[in-house]
């Protein structure tokens, strides 16, 4: 479990924190709080790590494990250096403000009033009681990480992740089959999700560990982020609506079961949902930070699943048609979104369509 905690802290906390630190520097208009940016960024660390690994394996195949592990660390270290030493950034001030926002809870409106605190605690207690009496709760909670990967989709993704790790190339991915193991792809989604297992295997080989605990933790982690995101969005209108909406997610047995199952659904739904929300916010506020977050989440939505890739094309078109600004600015934003979409997820589908399996065509 120590290795799992190390992987989780490094990828989901440290890497996500570096990304959050960079995004906060550009949050000049404060249309979105620094705390909300940090919470959103918790889901970006694993995805960024996966896409970095994708480009490393694509451009530098067949390298030893230490090469990819060190390359990822260097990438984040360079990002941190750029953030710290860029003359236009004031990292110290923004970092202090972020710490204050956690300490004083200035950004959380519902904690400013005693009545709201009581309501929040009551809702938490109710959710806890529901969990405690739910018939299958113990089955899903006890030994969750010790259960083998089971289920059609996740077994496929797990197999792919191990193949990427063993071969250090995407050759079989774009051929559609892997003769050595007899594995044949059943879908043409981007390898973003299975690469998280590849990343765990690479780190584990260096530290003498061979587990898949971190990969298994991805589903509940992004399930929790969905709950946080729903609360964050609905709290703009009403704190009570946010509490009700967050609690309502667990009123469905399907969401609860998905929360404690090995699957890609919550991972891809998180990026799909955030991309749609930031599309609307970008058009409404014309805020630079909202547009940046739209670019990032849209790219990862495409990279996580083919449905996200298809919807991303329509999302870019909607942005261009409904974003009210001078034509030159609309064109600039349009190509910025296209570029980020291509780098973060679209390239895979372009390459697969032209030189690979043909994707969905």
Predicted regions and their residues:
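Transmembrane-helix motifs of polytopic, lipid-linked glycan transferases
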Residues: 77-83, 214-237, 274
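Short hydrophobic/aromatic helix or loop-helix immediately within or flanking a transmembrane segment
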Residues: 53-55, 159-162, 179-208
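Membrane-interface alpha helices of multi-pass inner-membrane proteins
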Residues: 279, 290-306, 316-317
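Specific aromatic-rich, kink-prone transmembrane helix
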Residues: 15-20, 267-284, 297-298
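Transmembrane-helix signature of polytopic, membrane-embedded enzymes
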Residues: 32-39, 209-213, 230-251
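Short acidic/glycine- and proline-prone juxtamembrane loop motifs at membrane-interface regions
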Residues: 260-267
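Membrane-lumen/periplasm interface segments of specific transmembrane helices
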Residues: 136, 321, 325, 332-361
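Membrane-embedded, hydrophobic transmembrane alpha-helices
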Residues: 1-113
């Amino acid at each position: 479990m120590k290795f799992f905690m190390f992987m989780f802290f490094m990828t989901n906390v440290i890497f996500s924190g570096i990304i959050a630190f960079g995004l906060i520097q550009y949050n000049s208009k404060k249309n979105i709080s620094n705390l909300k940016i940090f919470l959103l960024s918790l889901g970006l660390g694993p995805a960024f790590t996966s896409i970095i690994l994708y480009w490393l394996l694509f451009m530098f195949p067949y390298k030893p494990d230490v090469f990819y592990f060190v390359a990822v660390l260097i990438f984040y270290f360079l990002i941190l250096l750029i953030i710290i030493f860029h003359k236009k950034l004031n990292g110290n001030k923004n970092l202090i403000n972020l710490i204050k926002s956690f300490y004083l809870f200035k950004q959380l409106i519902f904690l400013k009033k005693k009545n709201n605190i009581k309501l929040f605690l009551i809702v938490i207690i109710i959710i806890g009681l529901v969990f405690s009496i739910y018939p299958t709760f113990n089955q899903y909670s006890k030994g969750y990480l010790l259960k083998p990967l089971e289920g059609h989709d996740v077994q496929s993704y797990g197999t792919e992740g191990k193949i990427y790790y063993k071969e250090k190339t995407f050759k079989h991915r774009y051929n559609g089959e892997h003769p050595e193991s007899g594995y044949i792809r059943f879908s043409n989604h981007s390898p973003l999700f299975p690469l998280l297992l590849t990343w765990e295997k690479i780190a584990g080989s260096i530290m003498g560990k061979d587990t898949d605990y971190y990969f298994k933790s991805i589903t509940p982690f992004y399930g929790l982020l969905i709950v946080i995101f729903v609360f964050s969005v609905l709290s703009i209108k009403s704190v009570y609506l946010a509490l009700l909406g967050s609690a309502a997610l667990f009123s469905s047995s399907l969401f609860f079961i998905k929360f404690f199952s090995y699957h890609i659904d919550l991972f891809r739904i998180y990026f799909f949902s955030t991309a749609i929300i930031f599309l609307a916010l970008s058009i409404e506020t014309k805020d630079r930070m909202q547009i940046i977050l739209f670019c990032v989440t849209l790219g990862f939505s495409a990279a996580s699943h083919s449905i996200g890739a298809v919807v991303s094309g329509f999302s870019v078109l909607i942005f261009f048609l409904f974003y009210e600004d001078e034509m030159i600015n609309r064109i600039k934003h349009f190509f910025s979104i296209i570029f980020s979409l291509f780098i973060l997820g679209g390239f895979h589908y372009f390459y697969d369509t032209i030189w690979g399996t043909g994707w969905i065509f």
